[in-house]
């Protein structure tokens, strides 16, 4: 089954709104993870995150969503096109931790998979992502993990099948490390 580009855009927009709302809701079960007024949010990722820093990208939409809920935050855009988990780990200190965020969203996986032989194996991906989360949590940064969206519009292509194992790991890691999870891939399976 093919999914249109417009459908993917709607899902990304919906994600930004849901993410910002979820991060702002001061419910008792979320009280210890809700974004507070004045906090900084780093957005670590690849080209999707880099484009998210544009005026109508998901980084700006999330910040505007929080503002509409009365929560003023500062964005730290840290997306670089083409980057994989190993590159994000290598620049984590410089691009994220040195800026002392309270929160970090992590969007990583598409390039690890679809770059083929230049990609990152599932085993190495698990090590890289776990280290990123561990470094952030050791620095007192709360982490929201985003599962990766589809590669192309065909759910059944080989890359999407491979990506599903990476996303399964992210879901498992979020539970294990008590990270917030935005399961962007849930509706695309």
Residues covered by each model-derived region:
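Alpha-helical cap/lid subdomain in secreted, periplasmic
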Residues: 35-37, 60-74, 87-189
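Short beta->alpha junction loops
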Residues: 77-84
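N-terminal secretory targeting modules
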Residues: 1-44, 48-56, 63-72, 97-102
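A structural signal for the hydrophobic beta-strands that form the central parallel beta-sheet
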Residues: 43-44, 77, 145
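Glycine-/small-residue-rich active-site loops that bind phosphorylated ligands and cofactors
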Residues: 50, 84, 113
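Cofactor-binding loop segments of dinucleotide-utilizing enzymes, especially the Rossmann-like FAD-
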Residues: 46, 80, 148
């Amino acid at each position: 089954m093919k999914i249109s580009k417009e459908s993917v855009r709607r899902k990304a927009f919906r994600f930004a709104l849901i993410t910002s709302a979820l991060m702002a809701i001061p419910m008792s079960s979320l009280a210890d993870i809700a974004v507070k007024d004045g906090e900084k949010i780093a957005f670590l990722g690849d080209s999707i995150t880099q484009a998210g820093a544009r005026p109508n990208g998901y980084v700006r939409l999330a910040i505007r969503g929080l503002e509409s809920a009365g929560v003023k935050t500062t964005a730290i855009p840290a997306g670089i096109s083409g980057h994989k988990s190993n590159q994000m780990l290598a620049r984590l200190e410089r691009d994220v931790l040195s800026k002392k965020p309270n929160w970090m969203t992590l969007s990583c996986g598409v390039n690890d998979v679809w770059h083929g032989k230049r990609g990152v194996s599932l085993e190495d991906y698990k090590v890289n992502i776990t280290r990123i989360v561990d470094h952030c949590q050791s620095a007192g940064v709360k982490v929201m993990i985003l599962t990766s969206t589809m590669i192309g519009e065909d759910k059944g292509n080989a890359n999407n099948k491979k990506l599903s194992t990476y996303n399964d790991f992210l879901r498992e890691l979020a539970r294990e490390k008590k990270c917030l999870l935005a399961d962007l891939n849930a509706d695309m399976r």
